[in-house]
């Protein structure tokens, strides 16, 4: 899966979960600062990423995912 395909799938998940316009999401979008996500929101989102992409994201790695770009990079580098 290409980086662009991953980015678009992640944007879809974010738009559904955080009720934001998909077009407003960039790789620099910060989950906590820009989307007002709290720690529970982030845990739920990480679980959705795991389901969507079939990847397991350890807690120590999940803590490093602060932006949409971080999520894209992690999925890209850990896909089968």
UniProtKB/Swiss-Prot annotation:
Coiled coil: none annotated. The keyword tRNA processing does not apply. GO terms for cellular component: cytosol; membrane. 4'-phosphopantetheine is transferred from CoA to a specific serine of apo-ACP by AcpS. This modification is essential for activity because fatty acids are bound in thioester linkage to the sulfhydryl of the prosthetic group. The modification O-(pantetheine 4'-phosphoryl)serine is found at residue 39. GO terms for biological process: lipid A biosynthetic process. Pathway: Lipid metabolism; fatty acid biosynthesis. It is found in: Cytoplasm. HAMAP family: Acyl_carrier (MF_01217). Belongs to the acyl carrier protein (ACP) family. Carrier of the growing fatty acid chain in fatty acid biosynthesis. This is Acyl carrier protein. The gene is acpP.
